[in-house]
């Protein structure tokens, strides 16, 4: 009879202690916020795809791809011949160009 009395008092106490102490149920479901945030912190972060990591311009186009196309079109020149002559002309008109340094 005494054994049943102790078990009657001990079983709810042990169950209550296990639930609050571990913070989980039988299947690993989180009961407390503290345990759920710890579990979230252990999850790996998603890896960014290349397209998500690249910046885009106002039209939503990929800047890196656009720059590659422009450079491929220009060839080995830093600027195309037309761009270079327009740049020289603008600088001459603005008076910021020293004519002795450029042809």
Swiss-Prot record:
Residues with PTM 4-carboxyglutamate: 82-83, 89, 93
Cofactor note: Divalent cations stabilize the toxin the in alpha-helix conformation.
Signal sequence annotation: 1-21
InterPro entries per record: Conantokin_CS (IPR005918)
Residues the record marks as site: Significant for the subtype selectivity between NR2B/GRIN2B and NR2D/GRIN2D (similar potency for both of them): 84
Transmembrane segments: none
Entry's Gene Ontology molecular function annotations: ion channel regulator activity; metal ion binding; toxin activity
Residues that hold a divalent metal cation according to the record: 89, 93
Classification via Pfam families: Toxin_36 (PF10550)
Keyword Metal-binding carried by entry: yes
Membership in a protein family: Belongs to the conotoxin B superfamily.
Described function: Conantokins inhibit N-methyl-D-aspartate (NMDA) receptors. This toxin inhibits NR2 subunits N-methyl-D-aspartate (NMDA) receptor-mediated calcium influx in central nervous system neurons in the following order of preference: NR2B/GRIN2B (IC(50)=0.14 uM), NR2D/GRIN2D (IC(50)=0.31 uM), NR2A/GRIN2A (IC(50)=0.68 uM) and NR2C/GRIN2A (IC(50)=4.9 uM), when tested on rat receptors.
UniProt-recorded name of the protein: Conantokin-Br
Organism: Conus sulcatus (Sulcate cone)
